[in-house]
């Protein structure tokens, strides 16, 4: 995900900005209820602030993308944080007529001794205007909170999802309507690849 973090003479808490990440899940049960998880995350401009995490992902109903994730995070460098974490998550991606609806949310806690809570979510509705084009246009809302930083954004969104490729490219304008976390309002370009 690419986003201009901006520069300010009076720095505010940051929540967002350009970042990279990936995740692999390996099913340990045929039902899909228990999986091994391995992922990494880092701010694009501060790789040493990122981490790699390994853990177990439990979904009570294997066909429903909602569950609990227990991880051990290991920092890449001194700017990151090594700790255990517990995350509850859930979401849906469905189509209603010409509308594509995406809802996702997660909340959790990081640290066994020095505990910090976090939460974030997204709600987006996009419409396919032309059956011949794999482009959908709509609007979305994004929210996130962690110690010392919180924000809510709304804005238009456009997504390209080729039918024969597991790739989604989205371009949003995120207008910050609540919170004081950097970066300021602006465009966000996201690239997601799934297998």
Model-predicted regions and their roles:
Residues 28-30, 44, 58-64, 94-98, ...:
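Outer-membrane beta-barrel strand-turn architecture
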Residues 24, 36-38, 56, 70, ...:
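Membrane-embedded beta-strands that build the outer-membrane beta-barrel scaffold
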Residues 1-33:
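Outer-membrane beta-barrel initiation region
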Residues 73-140:
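Detector for outer-membrane/organellar transmembrane beta-barrel domains
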Residues 1-3, 9, 33-44, 52-54, ...:
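Transmembrane beta-strand segments that form the barrel wall of outer-membrane beta-barrel proteins
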Residues 158, 183-195:
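Outer-membrane beta-barrel "beta-signal"
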Residues 16-20, 48-52, 80-86, 99, ...:
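Residues that define the transmembrane beta-barrel architecture of outer-membrane proteins
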Residues 1, 21, 25, 53, ...:
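Outer-membrane beta-barrel proteins and related beta-barrel translocases across Gram-negative bacteria
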